[in-house]
Structure formats: C-alpha cells, structure tokens
Amino acid sequence: MSTFRVNKNVNYTVMSNHHLQDKRLSLKAKGLLSYMLSLPDDWDYSLKGLTVGCKDGLDSVRTAVLELEEHGYVRRQKVRNTKGQIIDYDYQVYESPVE
C-alpha cells in the first residue's frame, strides 16, 4: 500500500493526532474539532459562527460541541450581562482532553 503526502508549503494546520484517534468521538466531533483548531486564535467562536464554515446546520454543530464538551475537548463558559442574562459563551478548545 502506498502513502500519498501533500507538499505543505502554505495554508495548513499542525495539530495533535490525539482527538483523531480517540475512539470515544464520532467522526462529526473529530471533524468539528479539527476545524476549530484550524481557526485563528482570535476567532469569535459561536454555534452560528461554526456553521458558516460547514454544510452542517446549527443542531448538528450543537450536538458535536456537546460531545466535545462531554469528553473534555471544549469548555464553554457563560457570559452574563448585569441582569444575569446569558449574552455569549467563551470557548476554550483543547487538542487533548482536560478533566
């Protein structure tokens, strides 16, 4: 069996293989995490924003994010206004799961 490698000069992402080999994750979750890791550090993460770069809808992206949260690859912290209402989420994305 032969292996084909692409010459990586520009526009590629270096990331850990950990999540790609994690048997607990669905292919959808692995793909979404890979996509999230390819985004710039200052990207404004949101469920709606993540749907812009893929074919999946909001519900599909939401279930993948919840799966990644369950396994420690994503943490979302609620951001509240002065009235205590949730106005946003801060995302922390990890290449390897955290407890």
Give, region by region, the residue ranges found by the protein language model:
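N-terminal leader segment of winged-helix/HTH proteins
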Residues: M1-V10
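Short, Lys/Arg-enriched N-terminal segment that forms or immediately precedes the first helix
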Residues: N9-K23
